[in-house]
Amino acid sequence: MTEDKITGTLVFAVLTAVLGSFQFGYDIGVINAPQQVIITHYRHVLGVPLDDRKAINSYAINSTEELPTGPYPGDPTPTSWAEEETTASASLIIMLWSLSVSIFAIGGMIASFFGGMLGDRLGRIKAMLVANILSLVGALLMWFSKLGPSHILIISGRGISGLYCGLISGLVPMYIGEIAPTKFRGAIGALHQLAIVTGILVSQIIGLDFLLGNHELWHILLGLSAVPAVLQSLMLFFCPESPRYLYIKLDEEAKARKSLKKLRGSDDVTKDITEMRKEREEASSEKKVSIIQLFTNSSYRQPILVALMLHMAQQFSGINGIFYYSTSIFQTAGISQPVYATIGVGAINTIFTALSVFLVEKAGRRSLFLIGMSGMFVCAIFMSVGLVLLDKLPWMSYVSMTAIFLFVSFFEIGPGPIPWFMVAEFFSQGPRPAALAMAAFSNWTCNFIIALCFQYIADFCGPYVFFLFAGVVLVFTLFTFFKVPETKGKSFEEIAAEFQKKSGSAQSPKAAVEMEFLGATETV
């Protein structure tokens, strides 16, 4: 029996898979930098005069958005929307832009239910190939959006790309988790999130106006995700299928052994086969649980509600408001080069995501989540204070910028990765697929709400917007302190007992029997 090791085939397969995660991140971040360029093009398509500089500048400042990056001479002069164009046309532009951002999350929300199903039906490799069809269609629609009704093509392309990302957000972690050696499963699994934030960072860099984020090349920037989609599709033909899928789902032991020999670089795969045989026996003795049963069964109700709250905390903390509209926020904060500050956010996001890979296995999940949320609360307060006092104290722009950087850092320490870890640890094999699907749906739904509403909230609240998010973060921090148990190193039985304790009720005999049936002696 050989020790777990990293082989060339394993590295190739993992890097191929996380190209999908990279596309996911690229699609999240790509819409930010060319924001005003795209809005200007929308105005052109809808017949609003492009030389109406005052209205453009008023829109950029009053809605906290980036000033135009196009070749407009002179200094911006803020004026009222009402003086330059009708309320209806102004609302239409805002609605179309918000929809361009948020339709991505609608696609992800819908597709998040079907990633696991597609992977089980077609296999992990074929499922990722099929998903890439959606990625290519979405990218091509956006690539050619400059030639037609741009608002329709961009919104359609973003929606289809969202469908792709909803599928891939389940398929990639599933595949790399199943091919990874036990010793490296945690680190390899974390590469999914690392590839996402790397994709965000790359989209921010090449979205600079002197690269692709300008009036001539913005459509290429949006459609560039077609490149990793084509590359991944070609590379997938050389990747071995998941041995767990072959053995546990299809009962193809010979094919599973062949796949394992390639991945492990050894003819001795007894250890993996034994582990998979045990997993298959456990899975066959455990009934599957539907999404409805998660809420109707008393054994699952408290864990699933806490799981949903953790994902709501992640999204409603305001983090995606920063990711989607960071350039606008820095513009409002008085930063002279807001796009570069946005890239700084992406770089910090990447660095602290890598750091969290090590922290999450050393410290408790609940502790890191509380530290992250508490830090975000303080940063949100300083962010708003900086924005409110900016007119009187210009140096407050640096306070706001520093607060944003720290806000992102605290997010990646705890609320970013932790909910996904904890949801998997709340549930054993039977209810886990339904719980993860419900958690993914909740995450995408909240993502959509923030993407659609953040701009309207920012318009209404002005510089006080992050006071609102500070209040939300405080509520979720208190909820975590009183209701969320620590899961690191505990069995499902111990976690279930913690939930009963925090809900203030003793475990019923029926619930105890159910938890025993669900394999409550397993340690996470």
Swiss-Prot record:
<feature type="topological domain" description="Cytoplasmic">
    <location>
        <begin position="1"/>
        <end position="6"/>
    </location>
</feature>
<feature type="transmembrane region" description="Helical; Name=2">
    <location>
        <begin position="90"/>
        <end position="115"/>
    </location>
</feature>
<dbReference type="GO" id="GO:0015757">
    <property type="term" value="P:galactose transmembrane transport"/>
</dbReference>
<feature type="topological domain" description="Cytoplasmic">
    <location>
        <begin position="116"/>
        <end position="126"/>
    </location>
</feature>
<feature type="topological domain" description="Cytoplasmic">
    <location>
        <begin position="483"/>
        <end position="524"/>
    </location>
</feature>
<dbReference type="InterPro" id="IPR002440">
    <property type="entry name" value="Glc_transpt_2"/>
</dbReference>
<dbReference type="InterPro" id="IPR036259">
    <property type="entry name" value="MFS_trans_sf"/>
</dbReference>
<protein>
    <recommendedName>
        <fullName>Solute carrier family 2, facilitated glucose transporter member 2</fullName>
    </recommendedName>
</protein>
<feature type="transmembrane region" description="Helical; Name=9">
    <location>
        <begin position="367"/>
        <end position="389"/>
    </location>
</feature>
<dbReference type="GO" id="GO:0005353">
    <property type="term" value="F:fructose transmembrane transporter activity"/>
</dbReference>
<feature type="transmembrane region" description="Helical; Name=4">
    <location>
        <begin position="151"/>
        <end position="176"/>
    </location>
</feature>
<feature type="topological domain" description="Extracellular">
    <location>
        <begin position="27"/>
        <end position="89"/>
    </location>
</feature>
<keyword id="KW-1003">Cell membrane</keyword>
<dbReference type="GO" id="GO:0005886">
    <property type="term" value="C:plasma membrane"/>
</dbReference>
<feature type="topological domain" description="Extracellular">
    <location>
        <begin position="328"/>
        <end position="338"/>
    </location>
</feature>
<keyword id="KW-1133">Transmembrane helix</keyword>
<dbReference type="GO" id="GO:0005354">
    <property type="term" value="F:galactose transmembrane transporter activity"/>
</dbReference>
<dbReference type="InterPro" id="IPR005828">
    <property type="entry name" value="MFS_sugar_transport-like"/>
</dbReference>
<feature type="topological domain" description="Cytoplasmic">
    <location>
        <begin position="361"/>
        <end position="366"/>
    </location>
</feature>
<feature type="transmembrane region" description="Helical; Name=3">
    <location>
        <begin position="127"/>
        <end position="145"/>
    </location>
</feature>
<feature type="transmembrane region" description="Helical; Name=5">
    <location>
        <begin position="188"/>
        <end position="211"/>
    </location>
</feature>
<feature type="transmembrane region" description="Helical; Name=8">
    <location>
        <begin position="339"/>
        <end position="360"/>
    </location>
</feature>
<dbReference type="GO" id="GO:0046323">
    <property type="term" value="P:D-glucose import"/>
</dbReference>
<dbReference type="GO" id="GO:0070837">
    <property type="term" value="P:dehydroascorbic acid transport"/>
</dbReference>
<keyword id="KW-0325">Glycoprotein</keyword>
<feature type="binding site">
    <location>
        <position position="320"/>
    </location>
    <ligand>
        <name>D-glucose</name>
    </ligand>
</feature>
<feature type="topological domain" description="Extracellular">
    <location>
        <begin position="146"/>
        <end position="150"/>
    </location>
</feature>
<dbReference type="GO" id="GO:0033300">
    <property type="term" value="F:dehydroascorbic acid transmembrane transporter activity"/>
</dbReference>
<dbReference type="InterPro" id="IPR003663">
    <property type="entry name" value="Sugar/inositol_transpt"/>
</dbReference>
<dbReference type="Pfam" id="PF00083">
    <property type="entry name" value="Sugar_tr"/>
</dbReference>
<feature type="topological domain" description="Extracellular">
    <location>
        <begin position="212"/>
        <end position="216"/>
    </location>
</feature>
<dbReference type="InterPro" id="IPR045263">
    <property type="entry name" value="GLUT"/>
</dbReference>
<feature type="binding site">
    <location>
        <position position="349"/>
    </location>
    <ligand>
        <name>D-glucose</name>
    </ligand>
</feature>
<feature type="topological domain" description="Extracellular">
    <location>
        <begin position="459"/>
        <end position="463"/>
    </location>
</feature>
<feature type="topological domain" description="Extracellular">
    <location>
        <begin position="390"/>
        <end position="394"/>
    </location>
</feature>
<keyword id="KW-0812">Transmembrane</keyword>
<dbReference type="InterPro" id="IPR020846">
    <property type="entry name" value="MFS_dom"/>
</dbReference>
<dbReference type="GO" id="GO:0015755">
    <property type="term" value="P:fructose transmembrane transport"/>
</dbReference>
<dbReference type="GO" id="GO:1904659">
    <property type="term" value="P:D-glucose transmembrane transport"/>
</dbReference>
<feature type="transmembrane region" description="Helical; Name=11">
    <location>
        <begin position="434"/>
        <end position="458"/>
    </location>
</feature>
<dbReference type="GO" id="GO:0005903">
    <property type="term" value="C:brush border"/>
</dbReference>
<feature type="glycosylation site" description="N-linked (GlcNAc...) asparagine">
    <location>
        <position position="62"/>
    </location>
</feature>
